[in-house]
Amino acid sequence: MTEILTTSNSAEDLLDMDGRVSEQRLAQLRIRQQQERVTKELRDVIQIHQCKKGIFCLVKQAKISYEITATDHRLSYELGPQRQKFTCMVGINPIVITQQSGDTKGCIHCSCDSIECTYTLLKTLCGLRDLLPMN
């Protein structure tokens, strides 16, 4: 006799299976689904972001993550090393200036009640170089 085992991910089946462990699994599943939804929304907002800086905007250059905690929202960003090269003429001699900066990491916190502040946080990141000039 062959038994057919079926698996179901409905909330009722998870709770009936083994009580407290099922509740923990269900809570983890909800958290994971919420984080996946937030990640997808973040990707969408980054895709549609446009400003006059174009590809030089921090929103387009940075590796961005978004976290929702019980007390606040946090947009974390990370920029890799950046290199600038500038050439100018002094008389007839060219002068080349090369400048390199290391990794830049940071985060922007928001303690509002709305979970829909992703766009505002991205606009803040977009204007960050105007607020805090970096080399």
Curated annotation (Swiss-Prot):
UniProt keyword annotations, A-Z: Early protein, Host-virus interaction, Inhibition of host caspases by virus, Modulation of host cell apoptosis by virus
GO biological process: symbiont-mediated perturbation of host defense response; symbiont-mediated suppression of host apoptosis
Record field: transmembrane: none
Highest taxon of the lineage: Viruses
Pfam families the UniProt entry points to: Adeno_E3_15_3
InterPro entries: Adeno_E3-15 (IPR004985)
Function description: Protects virus-infected cells from TNF-induced cytolysis.
Family of this protein: Belongs to the adenoviridae E3_15 family.
Protein name: Early E3 15.3 kDa protein
High-level lineage: Viruses, Varidnaviria, Bamfordvirae, Preplasmiviricota, Tectiliviricetes
